């Protein structure tokens, strides 16, 4: 049974609350753009592609409800303004993720174009928006499978030759980039899924991904769900793993929240360190991201705003109480793991320089550096 993180049917949306994973499966209904803003900001849903999809669909659900109740304005311009204001509001929930901003901009242009038509009603503008949002959901799953296939083929060609394991490769990934971070299948984790399906995966390794533990809570959950051979490591074990030749790690594959025009990549904190380790150990380092994550308006990583999260996300940890062997898991509790009064710096992302990246996997192929040693990402939009 496939893992479903975003459940949508016309007029209804619910999300798998990722704050409770892996111990509890709870779906939260989303009725409005306001609901989506809080779900995204609180990280009940996360992952750049997923939050863009949830943002888009939340407004589709809100518009559908207004239509059904007869509360939507008949004036096309009024509905256009309503939609654009809601999109701007949702986009403020997670500023680093370019997919969210890109989706808001793209959907805004669609409703502006529709509202300019002669004799167009407010309902027709809303229905045009709903169709566009639903198509985003459909396209995301298709794009993720493309990323998985292209990435797996590249790794099989480029990385397996130098890895031990008789035609198979071990892959290390960071944070969560699977079905829980997208509309389905995943980006970097989609590459691992495709390698596994092709019988070319020796083993998958996932980092714990402190301080929010997306690796141990979410990626490990997906790997176990899909019966993919995998091992969890702490973030600080990555160097030792790459030095351990018998592990056969031939590639590190990560996702992205924003890729600048020159290839500099903002991703979960700790990604930059993994790229440095990969370069030192001669391991391929790949970024897996749809074209919607590439921001051609941002020239380099210096122009990417880095979100900082609350100190409590580093100094506290939440999970179920562990009882005796027969008792299983108890009630959820929050405990502190840091000295009271210590200062905290908690950036959610870091920026990996393009010079450390071997390839950027998109839904239309893998982009490598040209002879000049630079990525020319404008070509993926031609």
Swiss-Prot record:
Top-level EC class as recorded in UniProt: isomerase
EC number from the UniProt entry: 5.3.1.23
Keyword terms, alphabetized: Amino-acid biosynthesis, Cytoplasm, Isomerase, Methionine biosynthesis, Nucleus
Any single GO BP term: L-methionine salvage from methylthioadenosine
Location of the protein in the cell: Cytoplasm; Nucleus
Catalytic activity: 5-(methylsulfanyl)-alpha-D-ribose 1-phosphate = 5-(methylsulfanyl)-D-ribulose 1-phosphate
Pathway: Amino-acid biosynthesis; L-methionine biosynthesis via salvage pathway; L-methionine from S-methyl-5-thio-alpha-D-ribose 1-phosphate: step 1/6
Source superkingdom: Eukaryota
Active site residues according to the UniProt entry: 257 (proton donor)
Transmembrane segments: none
SUPFAM superfamilies tied to this protein: NagB/RpiA/CoA transferase-like
Residues the UniProt record annotates as site (Transition state stabilizer): 175
Example GO molecular function: S-methyl-5-thioribose-1-phosphate isomerase activity
Its job: Catalyzes the interconversion of methylthioribose-1-phosphate (MTR-1-P) into methylthioribulose-1-phosphate (MTRu-1-P).
Protein name in UniProt: Methylthioribose-1-phosphate isomerase
Native organism taxonomy: Eukaryota, Fungi, Dikarya, Ascomycota, Pezizomycotina
Recorded name of the encoding gene: MRI1
